[in-house]
């Protein structure tokens, strides 16, 4: 039991004013083993400090995502070492496990294998400090997991949705298909006409089965957990500013577990360079 012997050696050194060499010989413990703990603590000090600082800023991140960010910063570490410090510092959060429901006969779209092959789109609701409800149009690329836009307003009709899609298309091109639910904004004539004019296929999921639009549903969960629930929006403009800041961070900085803990924008760039 080296840990116990190290403690005894330290006690003997102090209590009997004995040298380290004599105390180690008396207890049958090598001096290298005795010093190991001190060196280990010294090696961990910088990593521990950075981990605590990062965890304070990224309160909803677990140790694996924090590990990815530390590695990206150039710190020599691995997930086991980070997990040990994560537990020692009491940074682990209790997460309520959600009940997973498996839908029988669920029809899901094939996984996208290239950018703009298939987008996923949905609407999310929240409110500002005055109690006024705000709506968010969320869009995710099924291949790169990038979020090209989160449109925030008090109402978002079909005409507004098509304008947002045209704006995104002017920057990155049109998708081949969009997966979406059966909400009135998406079943509108305006969006139907847009899809025919642009040659974009609309793939509507079955009513009451959001699992068929899993990519955007997962994204919406992260949006709510890391942004909506973590912020107090004083006004519509304040909500727009904070949500856009979160979107930029999601695309550019946040490690994505489905992309081997690489941020979506970096994944998209690397993919484009490999295909060039």
Stretches found by the model and what they are:
Residues 1-276:
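Charged DNA-binding/catalytic regions of mobile-element recombinases
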């Amino acid at each position: 039991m080296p840990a116990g012997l190290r403690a005894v050696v330290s006690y003997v050194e102090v209590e009997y004013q004995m040298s380290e060499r004599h105390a180690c010989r008396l207890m049958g413990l090598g001096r290298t083993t005795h010093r190991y703990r001190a060196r280990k603590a010294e090696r961990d000090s910088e990593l521990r400090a950075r981990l605590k600082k990062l965890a304070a800023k990224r309160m909803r991140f677990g140790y694996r995502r924090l590990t990815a960010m530390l590695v990206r910063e150039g710190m020599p570490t691995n997930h086991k070492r980070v997990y040990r410090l994560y537990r020692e510092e009491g940074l682990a959060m209790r997460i309520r496990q959600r009940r997973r429901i498996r839908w029988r006969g669920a029809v899901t779209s094939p996984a996208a294998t290239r950018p703009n092959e298939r987008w996923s789109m949905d609407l999310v609701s929240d409110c500002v400090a005055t109690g006024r409800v705000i709506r968010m149009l969320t869009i995710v690329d099924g291949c790169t997991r990038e979020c090209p836009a989160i449109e925030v307003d008090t109402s978002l009709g079909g005409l507004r949705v098509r304008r947002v899609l045209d704006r995104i298309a002017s920057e990155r091109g049109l998708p081949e298909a969009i997966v979406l639910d059966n909400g009135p904004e998406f079943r509108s004539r305006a969006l139907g006409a847009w899809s025919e004019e642009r040659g974009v296929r609309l793939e509507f999921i079955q009513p009451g089965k959001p699992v068929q639009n899993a990519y955007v549903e997962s994204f919406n969960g992260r949006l709510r957990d890391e942004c909506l629930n973590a912020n107090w929006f004083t006004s519509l403009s304040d909500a727009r500013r904070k949500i856009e800041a979160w979107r930029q961070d999601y695309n550019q900085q946040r490690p994505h577990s489905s992309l081997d803990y690489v941020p979506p924008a970096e994944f998209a760039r690397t993919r484009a360079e490999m295909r060039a």
